[in-house]
């Protein structure tokens, strides 16, 4: 339905109005039920055709407060001029915005939430800060060298014999050998001894005479077998506690080749699946003793060229042997000629008879060929 049922005249007639009940089929539209219950009211007077409605009239129920309190004359209300224009004063609608009922607390909120309190990071100690190792205080008897004296020693190195330098260099790897494996044992007494040893070695290195800068340094391109040997020759200490040294007593590992699990078959593999074996399509292939294919070809050739079959009929061979000449008389020669002519005529008659007899045979053969072709097509 184009109109809602509530606004139809048939539904509105229940209110006991004074409308004509014969006009029920016409969908009468009402804006208020009071128009039906109070009775028919006269329609509002419309303005002239020249005036254009820019504002609602006084009789309009939706005009709001403008119609009641407007003091302009009717001519000004119906005019289209700019000076007579007056904006509509619409009543403001009640806002649906909820009230702000939040009341901030006087005490400040805690920055650290309960989650942060429960899930704190673990108290992981610093690396190298072991509480079971007692920290050694520096001894007061150590001579403190001034910075100027250090610089002078760096620039002017004391001349020492080469034998003493070699002895100092030889002592270094021995001490390293002694302190290398002890770091792996977790006993506190051994760890304390390791710390003491390292401190002594560092003190020795600080007071050791440095080599002059003129000596050639071992680089990577010199082709030294091990970098550790080159460092030992130079006599420079490393920052690592345990310098890498390759193991000497370990035998080289022999590569073991695992046997392949796959064993290839000794016999020749037949590349034919079960599907190929079952679905070969042997009916289409001609067998050795089967002459069906040849016969079909012959039938097709006969169907296309049926004149070739008649040519296959053997013709009687005519003997054209010349008789021997006899010098006795002319009579036997004439007799021989007559015999040849008679034999030629007889052969012609036989050929005509054979051609007459072959015609019905050809018809029968052509019928058979047509039947076979029809069967082959089916």
From Swiss-Prot:
Where located? Cytoplasm, Cytoskeleton
For this UniProt entry, the molecular function terms from Gene Ontology, in alphabetical order, are: calmodulin binding; microtubule binding
One GO BP annotation of this record: dendrite morphogenesis
Record-level GO cellular component terms: cytoplasm; microtubule
Per its UniProt entry, which superkingdom is the organism in? Eukaryota
Q: Per the record, which residues fall in region Mn 1?
A: 79-99
Q: Where is the composition biased (Polar residues)?
A: 52-62
Residue segments, region Disordered = 36-111, 203-378
> What are the TM regions of this chain, as residue ranges?
none
Q: What is its main location?
A: cytoplasm
Q: Where is the composition biased (Basic and acidic residues)?
A: 203-220, 242-252, 265-274, 306-315, 359-378
Residue ranges for the region (Mn 2) are 112-135
Keywords noted in UniProt: Cytoplasm, Cytoskeleton, Microtubule, Transport
Enumerate the residue ranges of region (Mn 3).
Answer: 237-260
Annotated InterPro entries: MAP6
Compositional bias ranges of the Basic residues kind? 322-337
Task: Identify its protein family.
Answer: Belongs to the STOP family.
What's its job?
Involved in microtubule stabilization in many cell types, including neuronal cells. Specifically has microtubule cold stabilizing activity. Involved in dendrite morphogenesis and maintenance by regulating lysosomal trafficking.
UniProt name for this protein:
Microtubule-associated protein 6 homolog
Q: Tell me the organism.
A: Xenopus tropicalis
């Amino acid at each position: 339905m184009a109109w809602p049922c509530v606004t139809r005249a048939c539904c509105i007639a229940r209110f006991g109005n004074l409308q004509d009940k014969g006009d029920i089929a016409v969908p009468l539209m009402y804006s208020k039920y009071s128009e039906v219950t109070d009775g028919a009211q006269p329609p509002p007077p419309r303005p002239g055709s020249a005036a254009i409605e820019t504002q609602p009239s006084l009789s309009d129920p939706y005009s709001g407060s403008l119609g009641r309190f407007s003091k302009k004359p009717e001519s000004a209300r119906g005019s289209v001029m700019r000076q007579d224009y007056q904006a509509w004063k619409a009543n403001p609608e009640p806002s649906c915005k909820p009230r702000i009922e939040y009341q901030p607390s006087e005490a400040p909120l805690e920055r650290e939430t309960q989650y942060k309190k429960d899930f704190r990071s673990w108290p992981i100690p610093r690396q190298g800060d072991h509480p079971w190792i007692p920290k050694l205080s520096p001894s007061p008897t150590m001579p403190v060298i001034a910075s100027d004296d250090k610089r002078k020693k760096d620039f002017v190195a004391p001349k020492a014999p080469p034998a003493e330098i070699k002895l100092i260099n030889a002592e270094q790897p021995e001490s390293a050998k002694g302190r290398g494996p002890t770091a792996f044992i977790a006993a506190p007494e051994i760890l304390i001894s390791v710390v003491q040893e390292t401190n002594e070695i560092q003190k020795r290195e600080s007071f050791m005479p440095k080599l002059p800068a003129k000596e050639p340094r071992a680089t990577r391109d010199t082709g030294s077998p091990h970098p550790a040997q080159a460092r030992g020759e130079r006599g420079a200490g490393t920052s690592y506690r345990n310098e890498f040294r390759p193991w000497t007593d370990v035998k080289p590992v022999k590569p073991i080749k695992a046997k392949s699990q796959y064993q290839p078959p000794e016999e020749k593999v037949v590349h034919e699946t079960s599907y190929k074996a079952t679905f070969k399509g042997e009916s289409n292939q001609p067998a050795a003793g089967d002459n069906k294919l040849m016969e079909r070809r012959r039938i097709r050739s006969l169907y296309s060229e049926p004149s070739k079959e008649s040519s296959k009929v053997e013709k009687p061979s005519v003997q054209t042997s010349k008789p021997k000449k006899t010098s006795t008389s002319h009579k036997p020669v004439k007799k021989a000629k007559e015999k040849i002519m008679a034999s030629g005529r007889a052969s012609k008659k036989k050929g005509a008879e054979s051609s007459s007899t072959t015609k019905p045979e050809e018809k029968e053969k052509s019928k058979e060929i047509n039947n076979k072709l029809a069967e082959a097509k089916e």
